[in-house]
Amino acid sequence: MKLLYCMLGLSMAACTPQKTVNGGEDELSMLIGTYTDGTSKGIYSFRFNQKTGTATPLDSVELSNPSYLKPSEDGKFIYAVSEMNDSTAAVNALAFDKQTGNLRLLNSERTPGAAPCYVSTNGKEVLTANYSGGNMSVFRLRKDGTLSPAEALFKGTANGPDTIRQIVPHIHCALFSPDGKYIFATDFSADRILRFTLSSEGNISRLPGEAIGIAPDSGPRHLTFSPNGKFAYLINELSGKVIAFGYTDGKLEQIQSIAADSLRARGSADIHLSPDGKFLYASNRLEGDGIAIFTVDTVNGILTRAGYQPTGIHPRHFNITPNGKYLLAACRDSNVIQVYERDTENGLLKDTQQDILIDKPVCVQFIPPFHN
């Protein structure tokens, strides 16, 4: 069964009911970010049932290239980039109604660097990683959820061996540590991870030498932390390897490097752990598009290859439902979000054939069940 989401130009009223019903703990809010150089409008909201794997379209909002978005912890606000490679590059704050799925733009602020491709928030600040700008920008949040203008800007460097893709600085990811004391940013073109200290007042600083070097020609892309906060895992776009780190009070110590992309297509993309921390998934693009699956030793953080799931074309981003039952892959060039059921015993994936068809999907985010 495939859900066609307004790809034929139908209005939202024709695609969705005007009222929604509270389906209990199994009903999630789901938000989809897209590239808008085709027929896609911007951000789309759905109701997703994490028991059955079915999706119901609710609303959309027009926004240019919202290629990455992040909900606030309470789900009332959404922060989304506009990944534009010019002066219109921005980060946007939106109000979100979890009951109806309605999205409403509150305000936008320009990012000091072009092509913002990642956004994160701790409820007080918002970070953007600006790929073409080669920098990370910081925005303070007002009490009403809106963004203040950018206050700080931290630049990456470029000294990697790839004379095409590492010739200028690129920052691909910026996120807060689980303990909230630090910020980590992937310095793609310098093959390193930058570490910043975050004070209780929200001041951010980086001392000389506060960077974690990795192997040359790696192209660090996305970083994620284990549920228990003891380990971190990095997907490297160019080398196609996952690096496992032990994490203690701001320190990342490498414990393993293992291939996620055996074809060396230089297009690895996203990385996530299952909610129980027992399995890790990493997506690959350009050749052999799919998701590498690993088991995780939750005691020492070591990964073991468990399988590989072919997907649609260009799985730029994916996410796992809070109950761990489903993995949804946003396959940009197949214009589809594929819904996979997870085997919680071995981590393997099974295509449910409950595709969500939407033009150029590149980000999937969930908000926990809503309550009256």
Give the label of every model feature segment.
Residues 57-123:
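Blade-loop segments of beta-propeller domains
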Residues 102-173:
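Asp-box/WD-like beta-propeller blade repeats and closely related beta-sheet repeat scaffolds
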